[in-house]
Swiss-Prot record:
Entry protein name: Small ribosomal subunit protein eS4
GO-annotated biological processes: translation
Domain of life: Archaea
GO CC entries: cytosolic small ribosomal subunit
InterPro entries: Rib_uL2_dom2 (IPR014722), Ribosomal_eS4 (IPR000876), Ribosomal_eS4_central_region (IPR013845), Ribosomal_eS4_central_sf (IPR038237), Ribosomal_eS4_KOW (IPR041982), S4_RNA-bd (IPR002942), S4_RNA-bd_sf (IPR036986)
Family: Belongs to the eukaryotic ribosomal protein eS4 family.
An example molecular function term from Gene Ontology annotations: structural constituent of ribosome
Length: 235
């Protein structure tokens, strides 16, 4: 089994120099898809530049200095993805897409570093007549709240993962675009177009653009808005 990838073949979502080294780390199977995740080794060495060598980055992790979503992680090939919160030496960062579609780190404020937006990707009935929700980062949660639908975003507290807010996928709400030609942009939903064929459902925005529904991540409603981080960007 190959556990590393040539740097020239690393997905473009990972923003690293392509010719500095021959090999690039491959994320272990985890919550995020491999082509939409970045290893902690890459985060420490190439994004934040807290180390020059893999051995130094591994030592930082082994000392328990890195948290992901409020929990210590020591595996250097652990993959982090969209909306994950990384804490290193008291500084917090959130993983987001830039307008080229690459995953980058943005400095996050202390009051928002304990919040995790999670988009519902699937919803099934669980034993006990409860609802099981599957989220964009691979997490699964059981709840009794039947009002949550696929496409909605819940705001969970970290690290206990308790739902504090629900943002519906509906016209009038704000959204962040996670793919396509408008990746990294935000806009206000004007209309959701449901296709009766096998074509992808479309979402239209007040700003004049349209994208497929799978690329829309709602972040705000009249009741509550999750403010995207606007601090320093790495790398």
């Amino acid at each position: 089994m190959i556990n590393k990838t040539k740097r020239l073949m690393v997905p473009r979502t990972v923003k690293i120099p392509r010719k500095t080294y021959f090999w690039g780390p491959t994320p272990l199977p985890g919550r995020h898809k491999a082509d939409h995740s970045v290893t902690l080794l890459t985060i420490i060495r190439d994004y934040l530049r807290l180390s020059d060598k893999e051995r130094e980055a591994t030592r930082i992790l082994a000392n328990g200095l890195v948290k992901v979503d409020g929990k210590v992680v020591k595996e250097r090939k652990f993959g982090v993805g969209f909306m994950d919160v990384i804490e290193i030496s008291g500084e917090s960062y959130r993983v987001v897409y830039n307008n080229q579609g690459a995953l980058v780190l943005v400095s996050e404020s202390k009051d928002r570093a304990n919040m995790k937006p999670l988009q519902v990707k699937n919803k099934v009935i669980a034993p006990g007549n409860k609802i099981q929700l599957g989220f964009h980062d691979g997490r699964v949660m059981v709840t009794e709240d039947r009002s949550i639908s696929v496409g909605d975003v819940v705001i969970a507290s970290l690290p206990d993962m308790k739902i504090t807010e629900i943002i519906k996928m509906q016209p009038g709400n704000k959204a962040f675009i996670t793919g396509g030609s408008h990746v990294g942009e935000t806009g206000t939903i004007s209309k959701i177009e449901i296709k009766e064929s096998s074509s992808a459902n479309l979402v239209h925005f007040d700003e004049g653009f349209t994208t497929v529904k799978d690329h829309v991540f709602v972040i705000g409603s009249p009741r509550f808005t999750f403010t995207m981080p606007s601090g320093e960007v790495y790398p």
